[in-house]
């Protein structure tokens, strides 16, 4: 693809000036990486663990990290024949030995345990893995990361600046990050896009024309069909889609971001102005102008990692909306926000109240057996306003069980399908507040969320 020259060179240079690590930053990073590698080797020797390799992976090892980010991924590589139990036990022993010199340490768990530490100001993951022959013969999901590292390092040379530009551009568009909270583009996916298209400009131009189902297979070795919006076949594993975590909405948000940028390139696409928290007065004005009903389900945030929490929150969000639909409330939109100590599921409805009367339509009168059963059920029953025939069918006007959305959620939310930890937290206590009452929620981050919401 021809290089697109419509993006001003001085704009790219201005962005790089802000995001490209300085030589001093690089030297500090390299020194810390070398020190960490030495600490891991010393810990393994002290604990009599033989045949350990230390591998630096991730953007810091590939030269595609943004200035100001202090993340280092250290993989502690064990021989392939090591048992999983031994890898986890001995790997964590080594990690904890290294952590003795850290400012902070925290056990984390993906497919198997790893240790997150703060070491000389850097956020460091110490991850045990198996040293397998190829990314197609994995013993655990993290085993593929060193292969990603080698592929990118051998193909990205000379295009590191393009990766930096793309990462910051995606950040500006709110689509960077493959964690389940964001459902956006991972760093590895971003690097592969640059490798495939050749530059930042070419990638932006190409993305303007994408459609769901777009497939990119750099090595031309795909073995499987995928149904995700974007399919980036992993160059190291033909069965894997690197873009599997990317949601349809984030895929489309990126396309829109690219199109708007190409119309009028500017720094604001990389560095959008920060949003201020929404003031009470502004929220009340929005309530008055929108004339809708706003509900907030508030409960204590479960003490679990985001990648476990957010799928459960999205499940709860969908379950709450489905419950409201089932009882005739019209949902305009839903959203979730989570902080410490509270989590909020937001719902906007056309109206939070419905009439006390509800129309129940039965079968045609001539379908005798079913029609008579329907009539017998409602005729003369309590909470029935009256009955008649309309359009050849029995109709009864009955009293609505839940005329308010708030009452419905308070009484039926716990009967919905909720994730394990979220259900436990909601069961311990939740509150449904509506409209002006939402002003009680003062967390500044929530108020920024609220500004986007309204």
From Swiss-Prot:
Binding-site residues for CTP, renumbered to this chain: 59, 62, 148, 167, 176
Main EC class the enzyme belongs to: transferase
Oligomeric form and interacting partners: Homodimer.
Function: Catalyzes the addition and repair of the essential 3'-terminal CCA sequence in tRNAs without using a nucleic acid template. Adds these three nucleotides in the order of C, C, and A to the tRNA nucleotide-73, using CTP and ATP as substrates and producing inorganic pyrophosphate. tRNA 3'-terminal CCA addition is required both for tRNA processing and repair. Also involved in tRNA surveillance by mediating tandem CCA addition to generate a CCACCA at the 3' terminus of unstable tRNAs. While stable tRNAs receive only 3'-terminal CCA, unstable tRNAs are marked with CCACCA and rapidly degraded.
InterPro entries with a match to the protein in the record: CAA_C, CCA-adding_arc, CCA_tRNA_nucleotrans_2, NT_2-5OAS_ClassI-CCAase, NT_sf, NuclTrfase_I-like_C, Polymerase_NTP_transf_dom, tRNA_NucTransf2
Name of encoding gene: cca
Protein name, UniProt field: CCA-adding enzyme
Family membership noted in the UniProt record: Belongs to the tRNA nucleotidyltransferase/poly(A) polymerase family. Archaeal CCA-adding enzyme subfamily.
Record lineage: Archaea, Methanobacteriati, Methanobacteriota, Stenosarchaea group, Methanomicrobia
């Amino acid at each position: 693809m021809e290089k697109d020259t419509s993006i001003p060179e001085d704009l790219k240079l201005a962005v790089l000036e802000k995001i490209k690590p300085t030589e001093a930053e690089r030297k500090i990073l390299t020194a810390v990486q070398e020190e960490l590698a030495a600490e891991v080797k010393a810990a393994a020797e002290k604990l009599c663990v033989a045949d350990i390799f230390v591998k630096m992976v991730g953007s810091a090892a590939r030269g595609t990290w943004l200035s100001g980010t202090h993340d280092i991924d250290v993989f502690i590589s064990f021989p392939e024949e090591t048992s999983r139990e031994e890898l986890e036990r001995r790997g964590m022993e080594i990690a904890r030995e290294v952590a003795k010199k850290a400012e902070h340490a925290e056990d984390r768990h993906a497919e198997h345990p790893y240790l997150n530490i703060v070491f000389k100001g850097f956020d460091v993951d110490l991850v045990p893995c198996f040293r397998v022959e190829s990314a197609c013969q994995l013993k655990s999901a993290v085993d593929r990361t060193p292969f990603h590292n080698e592929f990118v390092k051998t193909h990205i040379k000379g295009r590191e600046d393009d990766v930096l530009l793309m990462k910051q551009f995606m950040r500006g568009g709110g689509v960077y990050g493959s964690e389940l909270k964001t459902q956006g583009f991972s760093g590895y996916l971003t690097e592969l896009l640059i490798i495939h298209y050749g530059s930042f400009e070419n990638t932006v131009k190409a993305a303007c024309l994408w459609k769901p189902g777009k497939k990119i297979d750099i090595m031309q070795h795909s073995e499987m069909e995928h149904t995700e919006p974007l399919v980036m076949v992993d160059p190291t594993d033909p069965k894997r889609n690197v873009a599997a975590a990317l949601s349809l909405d984030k895929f489309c948000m990126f396309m829109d971001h690219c199109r708007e940028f190409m119309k009028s390139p500017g720094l604001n696409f990389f560095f959008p102005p920060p949003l201020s928290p929404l003031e009470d007065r502004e929220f009340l004005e929005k309530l008055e102008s929108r004339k809708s009903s706003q509900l907030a389900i508030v409960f204590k945030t479960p003490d679990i990692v985001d990648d476990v929490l957010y799928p459960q929150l999205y499940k709860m969000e969908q379950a709450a909306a489905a419950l409201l639909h089932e009882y005739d409330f019209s949902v305009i939109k839903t959203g979730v926000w989570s902080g410490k100590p509270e989590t909020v599921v937001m719902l906007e409805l056309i109206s939070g109240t419905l009439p006390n009367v509800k129309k129940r339509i039965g079968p045609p009168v001539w379908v005798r057996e079913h029609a008579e059963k329907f009539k017998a059920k409602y005729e003369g029953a309590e909470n029935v306003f009256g009955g008649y025939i309309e359009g050849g069918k029995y109709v009864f006007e009955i009293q609505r069980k839940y005329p308010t959305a708030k009452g419905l959620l308070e009484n039926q939310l716990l009967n919905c399908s909720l994730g394990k930890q979220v259900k436990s937290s909601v069961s311990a206590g939740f509150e449904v507040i509506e409209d002006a009452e939402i002003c009680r929620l003062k967390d500044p981050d929530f108020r920024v969320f609220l500004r986007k919401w309204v």
